[in-house]
């Protein structure tokens, strides 16, 4: 693997360790990065599966947040060192560091790489499931993993890198992890690109997820990484020929959501986990750990199930004080957990695309069936899945900049007609699902679905 060695006079940037990677070969990290990797907060990511509950449907989906984070570190290194090599005298506006535009130096580059390394360190158990499913009813700024990543990164940097980084550097790292709308320009488009979603985080997880699950993907980020420029407006721009590579990237994301991330069985498992969480959170206060990063960093994918198992089957040397009603709630949670292990899962009885009535039609069906069978309502689950090019509902295509290799001084956007695939369908696909929790009424529910749709004809 070729490594760009920039002649920086900074001892802390000496390469210190080599990691094997099934995507990029070998990855070298600096001594500053190694100090972060060797913390308990970062090592916790070994016990955090990248794809949450997907491993219960796809046995190979066991790769972790740790390997993804190191992969993003390497892709960040490749991009930022290429920027330095191509534009050694260019100045950038970095408000956390200076009121005036400044040139890149060794420490700034190291900060950007650290941001890539730590961008996911704030994930909770089962990754996105923790925020998007388990904490949906919680109103707190720390419910978002990007915010927690910033908080944990600050804790680590102040503890482990106090001799290398000051408060301004730490604030800069946090702004790269979670940029706001005021953070403009190429520097803030590397790790987490709010402009159009083209960033090294996406490059790595698409490559890593498809590789580990053996799902073919036509997207390869190499051309985008090796051919971009920074235009006169300080945005990253790509050769106009790369519009097809970018289209493949967006389509790969959509396909991974369709095939894996939003697979119907994955989603019903998430609903079962939510029911478990609803039962035990009032007892164990798991959601309250987002107020205390020291406590939060003790959580892993195993935490929720271990709390249940330890309470139901306590070891002789562990004393647990649980009220009778609390114990009954934990027993109910354990029943759901055992059903997951024995594949006695919730079942989907119907799904309706938003364009065909979506939520309104699903709610109408629930009203229809509960009028006929009042006791069935608590056994039905209404759930929405969203699949698309990027997170959110904004169209990214008008924010992607291209250049002509014969005239690279000026960048431009391309009309949407230049992009193929899902662009003709819009940037998001919303589907509403109804799940049945009780296997005893499954046949009845499916029978009533047929009756309901017959009444609409």
Swiss-Prot record:
GO terms for biological process: dGTP catabolic process. Transmembrane segments: none annotated. PROSITE patterns: HD (PS51831). Gene3D superfamilies: Hypothetical protein af1432 (1.10.3210.10). Residues 65-206 form the HD domain. CDD domains: HDc. SUPFAM superfamilies: HD-domain/PDEase-like. SMART domains: HDc. This is Putative HD domain-containing protein L394. It comes from Acanthamoeba polyphaga mimivirus.
């Amino acid at each position: 693997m070729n490594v760009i060695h920039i002649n920086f006079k900074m001892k802390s940037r000496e390469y210190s360790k080599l990691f094997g990677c099934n995507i990029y070969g070998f990855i070298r990290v600096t001594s500053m990065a190694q100090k972060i990797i060797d913390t308990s907060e970062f090592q916790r990511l070994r016990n955090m599966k990248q794809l949450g509950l997907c491993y219960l449907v796809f046995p190979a989906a066991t790769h972790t947040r740790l390997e993804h984070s190191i992969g993003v570190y390497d892709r960040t290194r490749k991009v930022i060192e290429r920027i330095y090599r191509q534009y050694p005298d260019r100045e950038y506006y970095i408000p956390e560091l200076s009121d005036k535009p400044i040139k890149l130096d060794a420490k700034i580059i190291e900060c950007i790489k650290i941001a890539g390394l730590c961008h996911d360190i704030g994930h909770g158990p089962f990754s996105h499931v923790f925020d998007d499913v388990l904490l949906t009813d919680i109103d707190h700024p720390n419910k978002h993993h990007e915010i927690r990543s910033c908080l944990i990164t600050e804790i680590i940097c102040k503890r482990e890198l106090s001799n290398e980084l000051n408060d301004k550097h730490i604030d800069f790292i946090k702004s790269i992890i979670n940029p706001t709308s005021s953070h403009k320009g190429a520097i803030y488009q590397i790790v987490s690109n709010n402009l159009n979603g083209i960033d090294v985080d996406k490059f790595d997880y698409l490559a890593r997820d498809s590789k580990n699950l053996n799902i073919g993907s036509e997207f390869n980020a190499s051309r985008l990484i090796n051919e971009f420029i920074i235009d006169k407006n300080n945005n990253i721009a790509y050769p106009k020929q790369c519009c097809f590579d970018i289209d493949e990237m967006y389509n790969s994301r959509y396909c991974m959501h369709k095939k894996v991330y939003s697979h119907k069985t994955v989603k019903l498992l998430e609903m079962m986990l939510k029911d478990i969480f609803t039962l035990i959170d009032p007892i164990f206060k798991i959601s309250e750990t987002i107020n205390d990063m020291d406590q939060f960093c003790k959580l892993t994918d195993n935490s929720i199930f271990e709390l249940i198992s330890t309470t139901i089957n306590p070891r002789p040397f562990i004393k647990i004080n649980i009220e009778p009603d609390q114990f009954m709630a934990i027993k109910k949670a354990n029943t759901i957990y055992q059903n997951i292990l024995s594949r006695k899962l919730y079942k989907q009885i119907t799904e309706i695309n938003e364009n065909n009535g979506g939520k309104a039609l699903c709610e109408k069906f629930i009203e229809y069936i509960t009028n006929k069978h009042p006791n069935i309502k608590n056994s039905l689950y209404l759930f929405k899945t969203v699949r698309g090019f990027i997170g959110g509902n904004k169209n990214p295509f008008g924010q992607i900049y291209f250049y002509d290799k014969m005239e690279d001084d000026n960048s431009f956007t391309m009309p949407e007609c230049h992009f193929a695939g899902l662009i003709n369908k819009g940037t998001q696909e919303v589907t509403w699902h109804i799940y049945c929790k009780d296997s005893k009424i499954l046949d009845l529910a499916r029978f009533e679905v047929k009756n309901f749709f017959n009444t609409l004809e």
